[in-house]
């Protein structure tokens, strides 16, 4: 089967001067609206090409697939891909880079062809390096421009990128997409003390069309702006698009940000390893996350079997690059949790969709008295409450033989100003809400507005004090000999 789709080749060869008609909803109409069955036939042909390429160019994939008894010639159907191609975990990438530093033996281009180096911070262990070739960088820019077009952005719009410019791929991905879109790029950055107040001043002065960052930072920035005497609605933003953490698909969080800024919120973003990370992203008309399957092939799988779950069920997204040549990821397990559907979309795109976005990470889940709890469930519940002050912390502790959950929640200024009775009433409301949502009773402590530290990047809201108990228990056991 020959592949005859708009600018779809391997290696990718996009025309950097191409633009659709300004009135078009779609960048590539055929690729975005073709029947799912037809698209899957194209995807199968591309998977055959990508797998053959990786097997030839990468000792990592050759070794892994030989051990699993898989050869690219075995790939006759998407069922073959799902059942015969072993998944890759992040730990496999770290091991590969320890074995073959610095980029691992899954680098499929000569090191001299590497154009950009990004990676993880390494705060919890060895950092992972992302090597991106020059042609891949161009393809990423084209993919992100196309997806930003679907968000309603157009050449000449001003796009503020308010995220850290360092190893973090989020900021760079948004920037190069905006550049390819021929937008006015406003790479403000983040992470420097006092920068949020300056960002608010600049937004008030420049009046950009769109803002990219994290939901946590957008809420923090709004508070800083108000403290500076500025109204975030005066920034005249039309769109805020986010990645890096759950939030933009949580109705309470999304609605709150939209109300503060008077602008639409769109969720996007999978994994830095999967750059172009906008491969799952909403559109102007469609909420949640569309799986742009002709950029990155997404399967939502049962974490136990790594086989696709039916539409309408939960699982973990597993991603495969269809356009990357430098460090192609083939069946990389995200470790996130989501639900997918193939229901028709308001925008007319025929991709599968994650209607509730990413719930969180599977390893973020904790169990309290037999109930599985996800931090995003607590986020969503609190953001639906009118007297919530905007920040909270989840403290898990060990009392005797039982795990306990304490929720430290800010009340808004109006509630706190009314005194102890109003605070007590709000605490009772939070307790009732969480009992309904989580199915368990939760200890709730109400604290004053702005008493919990904000962040200009990803929020870390879970404090697990059970580690202290485990360490103490281990010391006692060691002392007993």
What residue ranges belong to the model's regions?
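Nucleotide 5′-phosphate-binding alpha/beta core
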Residues: 1-119, 125-142, 149-150, 205, ...
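Conserved ATP-dependent adenylate/AMP-binding module captured primarily in the ANL superfamily
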Residues: 140-158, 194-207
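Conserved AMP-binding loop of ANL adenylate-forming enzymes
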Residues: 145-180
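Conserved helix-loop-beta element of the AMP-binding
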Residues: 158, 227-248
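ATP-dependent adenylate-forming carboxylate-activation enzymes
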Residues: 186-201, 376
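AMP-binding/adenylate-forming catalytic core of the ANL superfamily
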Residues: 211, 318, 322-438, 457
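Adenylate-forming
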Residues: 217-236, 255-258
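Conserved AMP-binding/adenylate-forming
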Residues: 242, 247-249, 253-345
């Amino acid at each position: 089967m020959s592949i005859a789709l708009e600018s779809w080749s391997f290696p990718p060869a996009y025309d950097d001067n191409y633009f659709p008609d300004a009135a078009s909803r779609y960048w590539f109409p055929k690729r975005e609206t073709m029947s799912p069955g037809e698209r899957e036939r194209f995807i199968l042909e591309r998977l055959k090409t990508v797998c053959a390429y990786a097997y030839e160019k990468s000792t990592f994939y050759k070794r892994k697939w030989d051990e699993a008894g898989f050869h690219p010639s075995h790939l006759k159907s998407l069922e073959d891909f799902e059942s015969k191609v072993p998944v890759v975990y992040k730990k496999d990438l770290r091991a590969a880079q320890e074995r073959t530093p610095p980029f691992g033996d899954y680098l499929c281009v000569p090191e001299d062809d590497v154009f950009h180096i990004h990676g993880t911070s390494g705060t919890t262990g060895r950092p992972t390096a992302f090597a991106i070739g020059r042609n891949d960088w161009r393809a990423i820019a084209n993919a992100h421009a196309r997806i930003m077009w679907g968000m309603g952005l157009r050449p000449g719009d001003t796009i503020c990128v308010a995220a850290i410019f360092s190893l973090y791929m989020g900021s760079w991905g948004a920037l190069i997409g905006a550049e390819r879109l021929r937008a006015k790029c406003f790479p403000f950055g983040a992470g420097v003390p006092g920068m949020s107040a300056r960002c608010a001043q600049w937004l008030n002065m420049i009046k950009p069309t769109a803002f990219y960052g994290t939901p946590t930072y957008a809420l923090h920035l709004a508070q800083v702006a108000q403290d500076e005497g500025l109204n975030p609605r005066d920034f005249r933003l039309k769109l805020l698009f986010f990645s890096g953490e759950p939030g933009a698909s949580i109705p309470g969080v999304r609605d709150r940000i939209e109300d503060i800024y008077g602008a639409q919120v769109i969720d996007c973003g999978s994994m830095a390893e999967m750059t172009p990370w906008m491969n799952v992203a909403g559109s102007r008309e469609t909420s949640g996350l569309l799986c742009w399957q002709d950029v990155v092939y997404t399967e939502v799988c049962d974490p136990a079997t790594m086989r696709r779950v039916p539409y309408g069920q939960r699982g973990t997204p597993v991603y495969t690059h269809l356009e990357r040549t430098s460090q192609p990821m083939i069946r990389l397990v995200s470790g996130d949790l989501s639900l997918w559907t193939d229901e028709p979309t308001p925008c007319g795109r025929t991709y599968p969709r994650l209607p509730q976005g990413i719930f969180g990470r599977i390893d973020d889940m904790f169990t309290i008295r037999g109930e599985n709890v996800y931090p995003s469930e607590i986020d969503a519940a609190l953001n639906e409450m009118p007297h919530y002050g905007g920040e909270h912390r989840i403290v898990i502790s060990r009392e005797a033989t039982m795990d306990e959950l304490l929720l430290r929640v800010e009340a808004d200024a109006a509630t706190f100003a009314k005194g102890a009775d109003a605070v007590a009433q709000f605490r009772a409301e939070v307790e009732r809400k969480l009992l309904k949502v989580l199915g368990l009773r939760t200890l709730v402590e109400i604290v004053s507005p702005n008493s919990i530290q904000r962040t200009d990047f990803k929020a870390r809201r879970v404090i697990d004090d059970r580690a202290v108990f485990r360490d103490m228990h281990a010391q006692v056991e060691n002392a007993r000999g």
